[in-house]
Swiss-Prot record:
UniProt cross-references to SUPFAM superfamilies, sorted A to Z: C-terminal UvrC-binding domain of UvrB (SSF46600), GIY-YIG endonuclease (SSF82771), RuvA domain 2-like (SSF47781)
Residue span(s) of domain UVR: 201-236
Gene: uvrC
BP GO terms, sorted: nucleotide-excision repair; SOS response
Sequence similarity: Belongs to the UvrC family.
Sequence ranges assigned to domain GIY-YIG in this UniProt record: 13-91
Name of the featured protein: UvrABC system protein C
GO cellular component entries: cytoplasm; excinuclease repair complex
GO-annotated molecular function: DNA binding; excinuclease ABC activity
Swiss-Prot/TrEMBL keywords: Cytoplasm, DNA damage, DNA excision, DNA repair, Excision nuclease, SOS response
Annotated disulfide bonds: none
Function: The UvrABC repair system catalyzes the recognition and processing of DNA lesions. UvrC both incises the 5' and 3' sides of the lesion. The N-terminal half is responsible for the 3' incision and the C-terminal half is responsible for the 5' incision.
Organism from which the protein derives: Actinobacillus succinogenes (strain ATCC 55618 / DSM 22257 / CCUG 43843 / 130Z)
Length: 608
């Protein structure tokens, strides 16, 4: 449940942009304001202006803000965020995780794709983009402008005729001979490369020259095609979010520190475009000098190659670095070009550094308030349960679709809130489909039927369910054969109300047998709802991944005797998985490397 009063206390009277999130941590609305505090306060008045606003407010679980130096800048940044996130409540503006990159591979017919992680694949990397949504949007845009393939090599190498992407004009079918020459394809690749580098005008100049050449040669069909491409590129350029100052690729880094907590704010600028900002809260030893913290952060942020980050040409910081020259040298060596670190920003860079500083302070204020609120919620829960301390809590939930692809989730909270590195999921197998009780028992045994160090033993275990689920959990604990004290955790069931609305939960306390209904404004209930919702979302996301994996598997992977080479041969000679499924026994047996006996097994397996 979102605590609007606590949130609004720390929102400044500054221009900026705000992003609203729902319970799945998805951005559902982006807005701008001349005065953030006044604008955000208007959402939480008793009488709202429309049903849409009421629905929006009811879905909010958290809000993030970005302070800007002017209302105009807020408008531009709002535009960028809306393009990135495409929130469902910004319907009127729709036309307008390491970090993800866009990869252009180095091959005869390069493909363009989203990419995360260490840069092990040969090719060019463009980014970083602040969110995967920005990458998806850019790829979709590129596919419309420049028909370059985005398919995996396993698909590209096994095509005998063009796919649907060719039919709708999103790919020029380099996979099949006779549809596009290597020179024509490379020209489209070069346009995409220039576009990603921000050299929009060069793309237009090339296309205009091509159109004029085709016109002079009376090749009006190609001239019309180039004309349409020029119009599409111009339409995109007109809508792009570009800084008025053509700044170099740079990251702006600012640090705010208060009460033992540090916030590092990074503002990303690429090709003159402000891609977005992110806040980091590193663990900081007491009395750490901020110059030292800046140097440590810069080193960890850019020099860890496995994170696959691109080092910008310029890094602007707000504290002097003692080892600045050494860090510059290391970063330059890694980037293969000169990288400078500036601690005396002037002009436009100074303006953006001030912007990063404001956002660092605002994010730190919210973080400190959040930490205080978590402490207050923990104290309320300790009082409710009459416990001296609560160091660790865990919560379980089950997710499945009609009993299939069942997943159990376990989330962990410590005194700082969610402890995400300790989150776990469990595949549930060997039970009757839809038997949530058996699924819960199996998950608990997988989690606890082993040795645990003292700090890993939870003080409280929440079970998302009523008496039945709790009793099955107690049964599972009773059957544990472990050395650690299995009676230490307090098992608590969270039973939903009659109409399953938040605030109507009943807590079932295993140690006393009491059933407790708390007031919707109770801080202990807010903490319980938080951990329950985390567990629910963690279970659902795991289940969706498992379901998608099962859906996308071809079916050949499970057939004994069909390895990668035979699988590839089947897909190639029979025209993909649909062709394999529709093939006769004789057609399968005619594939090189497939015996009659194996063909019969494949045929029967896929048919039944």
């Amino acid at each position: 449940m979102f605590d609007s009063k606590a949130f609004l206390k720390n929102v400044p009277h500054d221009p900026g942009v705000y992003r609203m999130f729902d319970k799945t941590d998805t951005v559902i609305y982006v807005g701008k304001a001349k005065d953030l505090k006044k604008r955000l306060s208007s959402y939480f008045r008793p009488n709202l202006s429309s049903k849409k606003t009421e629905a929006l407010v009811a879905s909010i679980t958290r809000i993030e803000t970005t302070i800007t130096t002017s209302e105009t800048e807020a408008l531009l940044l709002e535009h960028n965020y809306i393009k990135t996130f495409q929130p469902r409540y910004n319907v009127l503006l729709r036309d307008d995780k390491s970090y993800p990159y866009i990869l252009l591979t180095k091959e005869r017919h390069p493909r363009i794709a989203a990419y995360r992680g260490a840069k092990k694949i040969q090719g060019e990397y463009f980014g970083p983009y602040p969110h995967a949504g920005a990458v998806r949007e850019t790829l979709s845009l590129l596919q419309k402008l420049f028909p370059i393939r985005q398919c995996e090599n396993s698909v590209y190498k096994n095509r005998s005729r063009p796919c649907l992407q060719y039919q709708i004009g999103r790919c020029c079918a380099p996979c099949v001979a006779g549809y596009v020459t290597d020179e024509e394809y490379q020209a489209q690749v070069e346009y995409a490369r220039l576009f990603l580098q921000g050299k929009d005008q060069q793309v237009l100049d090339h296309l205009i020259a091509k159109m004029e050449t085709a016109s002079r040669a009376l090749d009006f069909e190609n001239a019309a095609r180039f004309r349409d491409q020029i119009q599409a590129v111009r339409a995109v350029i007109e809508k792009q979010f570009v800084s008025n100052d053509r700044l170099d690729d740079m990251d702006i880094i600012s640090i705010a520190y208060r009460h033992g907590v540090a916030c590092v704010q990074v503002l990303f600028i690429r090709q003159g475009k402000v891609l977005g900002n992110r806040s980091y809260f590193p663990k900081v030893p007491a009395n750490t000098d901020l110059s030292e913290l800046t140097a440590t952060f810069v080193g960890q942020f850019y020099l860890q190659a496995h994170q696959g980050r691109t080092v910008p040409n310029s890094i602007v910081v707000d504290h002097k670095l003692e080892a600045k020259e050494e860090i510059e040298q290391l970063l330059s060596e890694q980037a293969g070009r000169k990288v400078s670190i500036q601690d005396n920003a002037k002009g436009s860079k100074s303006k953006y550094l001030s912007l990063a500083q404001m956002n660092a302070k605002a994010a730190l204020t919210l973080k400190l308030k959040e930490s205080t609120l978590i402490s207050e919620r923990y104290r309320a829960l300790r009082e409710l349960l009459d416990m001296d301390k609560i160091n660790r809590m865990e919560c379980f939930d089950i997710s499945h679709t009609m009993g299939e692809q069942t997943i159990a989730s376990c989330v962990v909270f410590n005194d700082a809130g969610p402890f995400k590195s300790e989150y776990r999921r469990f595949n549930i197998e060997g039970i009757t489909g839809g038997d949530d009780y058996a699924a819960m028992e199996q998950a608990l045994k997988k989690r606890y039927d082993r040795d645990l160090t003292p700090e890993k033993i939870p003080d409280i275990i929440f079970i998302d369910g009523g008496k039945g689920q709790l009793n099955r959990a107690l049964k599972a604990f009773g059957e544990l054969n472990v050395k650690w004290d299995k009676n230490r955790p307090h098992l608590i069931g969270i039973a939903k109300g009659v109409d399953r609305r938040a605030g109507q939960e009943t807590l079932i306390l295993s140690k006393t047998g009491r059933e407790v209904n708390l007031d919707p404004d109770n801080l202990a209930l807010h903490l319980i709802q938080h951990i329950r919702d985390e567990s629910h979302n963690h279970a659902i996301s795991g289940h969706r991944k498992k379901r998608q994996k099962a859906f996308t598997q071809s079916g050949l992977e499970t057939i004994e005797g069909v390895g990668p080479k035979r699988r590839q041969a089947l897909l190639k000679y029979l025209g993909g998985m649909q062709g394999v499924k529709n093939a006769t026994l004789e057609e399968i047996a005619s594939v090189p490397g497939i015996s009659r006996a194996l063909a019969e097994i494949i045929f029967e397996t896929l048919k039944h």
